[in-house]
From Swiss-Prot:
The enzymes which catalyze the reversible phosphorolysis of pyrimidine nucleosides are involved in the degradation of these compounds and in their utilization as carbon and energy sources, or in the rescue of pyrimidine bases for nucleotide synthesis. InterPro entries: Glycosyl_Trfase_fam3, Glycosyl_Trfase_fam3_N_dom, Glycosyl_Trfase_fam3_N_dom_sf, Nuc_phospho_transferase, PYNP-like_C_sf, PYNP_C, Pyrmidine_PPas_bac/euk, Pyrmidine_PPase_CS. It comes from the Bacteria. HAMAP family: Thymid_phosp. Keywords: Glycosyltransferase, Transferase. Belongs to the thymidine/pyrimidine-nucleoside phosphorylase family. The keyword Transferase applies. Homodimer. Its EC number is 2.4.2.4. This is Thymidine phosphorylase. It comes from Shewanella frigidimarina (strain NCIMB 400). NCBIfam families: PRK05820.1 (NF004490), T_phosphoryl (TIGR02643), Y_phosphoryl (TIGR02644). The gene is deoA.
């Protein structure tokens, strides 16, 4: 038997906690036998004194096991359970293509996603734009769709990782969100509760990223790779660029349109294609579906070209209650904004630098994101045809198309976009879409 205050004291003094002590404290979070004040103090102690990798692994496993851990054995699936997680960005629509692509290659993707908060969009919010789609299905329906379609993208259910829900809400109110140890455990406990064999982690870098610097993003990527592999799930992290909007758009319905155009081959934004392929290929390799990068890419391009990936998306949407002809007739079902109009730069030149975070906040201002949890969203609003860094803009080539519901909202977003995209006399140096891979062998 331990005392919560002694565990807090030990960590406050910079000592290493045992697995049993961490397990005891997490049990206390789950069952309300440690107080909010004690949880806040523990979070602050970890924030200042940190945890070593063994402590992080113990915390992740204890939080993962605080609720239901999904088990897929009874379904007799003939492929690996694989998934991807992103630290969040703007125009990051990857999940909508990657899940169906991996499924069409023989993987099973039970993706438990979140809603947007702050400047980043949430995968679940995009699916809420699809009429009838159930983001919170019963566990029976979730399992059925994973088996039949190979992929199901849903929200976190109440019985998964209850310790994280309580701990995170307290961290949010006590300025301890930014601890690498606690971020690692929070992300991975939720992901690993899905019963995964393998995980590809997308850690964003740049002006639209969650972590403020490249160094901090790399530290988080290393921590996640080490802890996930230590907890028994094969994991690779990719450091990817978020110094500009990833897709050609940002919002909810507008991103669903771009995802379908990508899957059906109507249009594939080259940066979006590069990052999606990098992550998805890594999932196939970790899951044993492909032996190497070349084989993985060949398989992925095949399912994009033969329509199997689009078919998996369609099966998932109809299986979770959406329209059966959604891929063919998506525009009939998705909401449209009243005003769709371009915003131009004040001078001609090249898109030189972007404050991607501010562009994400412009979508929030339009009504496409949340200022606080629980806010209702307008799924029709957002940005499309967002210029890429290095692109020439002038009186004929806009910075973006704004989808707004009122003239006031349009004007506010237009001013924010003009301020967020800096115009230069020449194109900036090109940055890579993927900076590096961090695999278990690199640690």
């Amino acid at each position: 038997m331990f005392l919560a205050q002694e565990i807090i004291r030990k960590k406050r003094n910079g000592d290493v906690l045992s697995t049993a002590e961490i397990q005891f404290f997490v049990d206390g979070i789950t069952h309300n036998t440690v107080s909010e004040g004690q949880i806040a103090a523990f979070g602050m102690a970890v924030y200042f004194k940190d945890m070593n990798m063994d402590e992080r692994i113990a915390l992740t496993i204890a939080m993962r096991d605080s609720g239901t851990v999904l088990n897929w054995d009874s379904l007799g699936l003939n492929g690996p359970i694989i998934d991807k997680h992103s630290t969040g960005g703007v125009g990051d629509v990857i999940s909508l293509m990657l899940g169906p692509m991996a499924a069409a290659c023989g993987g099973y993707v039970p993706m438990i996603s979140g809603r947007g908060l702050g400047h980043t969009g949430g995968t679940l919010d995009k699916f809420d734009a699809i009429p009838g789609y159930q983001t919170e299905p019963s566990s029976e329906l979730f399992r059925k769709v994973v088996k039949d379609a190979g992929v199901a993208i849903i929200g976190q259910t109440g019985d998964l990782v209850p310790a994280d829900k309580r701990f995170y809400s307290i961290r949010d109110n006590t300025a301890t969100v930014e601890s690498i140890s606690l971020i690692t455990a929070s992300i991975l406990s939720k992901k690993l509760a899905a019963g995964l064999d393998a995980l590809a982690m997308d850690v964003k870098v740049g002006s639209g990223a969650f972590m403020p610097t490249y160094e901090a993003s790399e530290e988080l990527a290393r921590s996640i790779t080490a802890v996930a592999n230590g907890a028994g799930t094969k994991t690779t992290a990719l450091l990817t660029d978020m110094n500009q909007v990833l897709a050609s758009c940002a919002g909810n319905a507008v991103e669903v349109r771009e995802a379908i155009n990508f899957l059906t081959g109507q249009y594939r934004n080259p940066r979006l294609y590069a990052v999606t392929m990098g992550l998805c290929a890594e999932m196939l390799i970790l899951g044993g579906i492909a032996q190497n990068e070349a084989e993985a890419r060949h398989k992925l391009n095949t399912v994009l070209d033969n329509g199997k990936a689009a078919e998996a998306f369609a099966k998932m949407v109809s299986g979770l209650g959406g329209p059966t002809d959604f891929v063919e007739a998506y525009d009939k079902y998705l909401p449209h904004a009243k005003i769709v109009r371009p915003v131009y730069a004040n001078t001609s030149g090249f898109a030189y630098k972007m404050d991607t975070r501010e562009l994400g906040l412009a979508v929030v201002t339009l009504g496409g994101g949340r200022r606080k949890p629980g806010d209702a969203l307008d799924y029709s609003v957002g940005l499309t045809q967002v210029c890429a860094l290095g692109q020439e803009v002038n009186k004929d080539v806009p910075l973006a198309m704004i989808h707004a519901q009122s003239e006031d909202a349009f004007a506010e977003a237009a001013a924010a976009i003009q301020q967020a995209i800096i115009i230069g006399d020449s194109a900036p140096e090109k940055t890579p879409e993927i900076y590096r891979y961090i695999r278990a062998s690199d640690l």
